[in-house]
């Protein structure tokens, strides 16, 4: 869910004009033996490392790195009796601090195996040009000396948007990283997470599930921005618009992880719908966005019951489970910084604010930053929220306390100062600033115009 419309056009241009990519001829995950677990893996504890390997990161961050590793580890889907495996990619900078770990929630926003960070970060940026955003953000943490771990949080089912899956697989990725003895990381290291948009789903659910699923992890803070915290509200907002492709990806992720939803949709979705839902399982985010431009998923050509499929009790039961804040048992026990643009045209602002209020009601410590300038659309806020999120997480890793309870703040920034963190960080901030472009229009109107043309 990460692309506001300005960024969508600029990002492809930047990748080509700056010649950031040198692709390698890598086997895709489904053809790479590393991803296949050894015999007996099902009996291992969650977080157990099954394989490890050194890898080359083929993006701008390679200049920041001492080394990079990948771990195949045991994890689960929605419940403990659904064992599976996935991979996390660990990046270790030259000046690594061994008492801190950053979970970076890459916003892959697609279900195909080749869209996962374990592949795209090795294959090069042009395998998914929107990865430039991810690189710019991760560079900040690496430059500060933090080890970064990036789990493939959707597993083998392409569970995009299925929050309990993403949260569990992220927490097990943290467990595996902390247990890995070749990077010098303290086993009780402080842990923070950073995620925006689709990464906000991952990071938000990691925060929400940590207390019940992985209480031993020493988490100290989570940043989640532009978060689609309510799937029903998300579908209602983007269906039929330029970002309708996220509906296809999200439906596919929910159907693949909720068998009762699959049984229902198999009855009411048309053959064309079944074909449509295969596309996000084989392609990455940019292709999905373009393929489903202005697609109306309520049309009878997709659903024989029209819009009613979304509100069928079996579907609503699943979507309610996937709405952050509805279950008090899944309330973060570690401080959270939420950020959201008031003009977000992808992830509904009101839904994220409801999550904030619910978490606060249930005792969480949450700071909610509203990017209140009218031009603070989804893509713009991806960039403008990055430095505040980084600084807030850095304070947590440095042991600085937060103000307890909940509070709301308004931020009117619409730009990035590439000198804001000093010259050591100018390359990362300059990259993000370049993605924002010289012009900003209300609700990212520039790409909307381009798409209509």
UniProtKB/Swiss-Prot annotation:
Entry EC number(s): 3.1.1.-, 3.1.1.3
Catalyzed reactions: a triacylglycerol + H2O = a diacylglycerol + a fatty acid + H(+); a monoacylglycerol + H2O = glycerol + a fatty acid + H(+); a diacylglycerol + H2O = a monoacylglycerol + a fatty acid + H(+)
Gene Ontology terms: biological process: lipid catabolic process
SUPFAM superfamilies listed in its UniProt record: alpha/beta-Hydrolases
Top-level division of the source organism's lineage: Eukaryota
Keywords, in A-Z order: Cell wall, Disulfide bond, Glycoprotein, Hydrolase, Lipid degradation, Lipid metabolism, Secreted, Signal, Virulence
Compartment(s) where it occurs, according to its Swiss-Prot or TrEMBL record: Secreted; Secreted, Cell wall
Signal peptide start-end: 1-19
Family annotation (InterPro entries): AB_hydrolase_fold, Lipase_secreted
Entry keyword Zinc: no
One GO MF term attached to the UniProt entry: triacylglycerol lipase activity
Function comment: Secreted lipase involved in Dandruff and seborrheic dermatitis (D/SD) probably via lipase-mediated breakdown of sebaceous lipids and release of irritating free fatty acids. Has triacylglycerol lipase activity and is able to hydrolyze triolein, tristearin, trilinolein, tripalmitoylglycerol and trihexadecenoin. Hydrolyzes diacylglycerols such as distearin, dilinolein, dipalmitoylglycerol and dipalmitolein. Mostly converts monoolein to di- and triolein, while free fatty acids are only produced in low amounts.
PANTHER family, sorted: LIPASE 5 (PTHR34853:SF1), PTHR34853
The protein, known as: Secreted triacylglycerol lipase LIP3
Gene responsible for this protein: LIP3
């Amino acid at each position: 869910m990460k692309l506001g419309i300005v960024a969508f056009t600029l990002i492809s241009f930047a990748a080509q004009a700056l010649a950031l990519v040198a692709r390698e001829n890598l086997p895709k995950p489904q053809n790479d033996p590393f991803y296949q677990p050894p015999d007996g893996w099902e009996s291992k504890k969650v977080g157990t490392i099954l394989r490890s390997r050194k890898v080359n990161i083929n993006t701008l961050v390679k200049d920041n790195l001492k080394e990079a590793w990948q771990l195949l580890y045991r994890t689960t889907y929605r419940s403990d009796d659904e064992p599976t495996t996935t991979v996390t990619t660990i990046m270790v900078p030259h000046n690594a601090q061994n008492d801190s770990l950053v979970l970076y929630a890459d916003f892959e926003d697609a279900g195909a195996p080749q869209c996962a960070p374990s592949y795209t970060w090795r294959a090069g940026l042009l395998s998914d040009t929107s990865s430039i955003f991810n690189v710019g953000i991760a560079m900040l943490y690496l430059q500060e000396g933090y080890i970064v771990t990036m789990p493939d949080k959707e597993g083998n089912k392409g569970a995009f948007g299925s929050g309990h899956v993403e949260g569990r697989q992220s927490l097990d990725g943290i467990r595996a990283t902390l247990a890995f003895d070749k990077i010098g990381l303290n086993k009780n290291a402080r842990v923070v997470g950073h995620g925006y948009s689709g990464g906000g789903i991952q990071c938000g659910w990691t925060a929400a599930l940590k207390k019940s699923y992985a209480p031993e992890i020493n988490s100290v803070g989570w940043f989640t921005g532009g978060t689609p915290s309510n799937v029903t509200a998300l579908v209602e907002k983007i269906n039929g618009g330029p970002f309708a492709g996220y509906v296809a990806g999200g439906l596919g992720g929910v159907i693949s992880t909720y068998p009762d939803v699959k049984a229902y949709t198999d009855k009411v979705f048309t053959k064309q719908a079944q074909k449509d839902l295969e596309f996000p399982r084989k392609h990455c985010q940019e292709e999905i966005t373009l393929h489903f431009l202005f697609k109306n998923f309520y049309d009878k050509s997709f659903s024989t019951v029209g819009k009613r499929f979304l509100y069928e009790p079996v579907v609503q039961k699943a979507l309610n489970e996937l709405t952050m804040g509805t279950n008090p048992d899944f309330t973060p026990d570690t401080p959270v910084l939420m950020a959201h643009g008031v003009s977000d045209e992808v992830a509904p602002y009101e839904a994220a604010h409801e999550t904030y209020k619910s978490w606060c009601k249930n005792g969480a410590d949450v700071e909610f930053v509203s990017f209140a300038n009218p031009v603070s659309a989804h893509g713009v806020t991806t960039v403008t929220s990055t430095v505040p999120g980084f600084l807030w997480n850095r304070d947590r890793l440095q042991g600085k306390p937060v103000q307890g309870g909940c509070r709301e703040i308004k931020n009117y920034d619409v730009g990035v100062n590439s000198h804001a963190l000093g010259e050591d960080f100018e390359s990362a901030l300059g990259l993000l600033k370049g993605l924002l472009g010289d012009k900003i229009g209300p609700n990212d109107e520039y790409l909307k115009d381009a798409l209509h043309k």
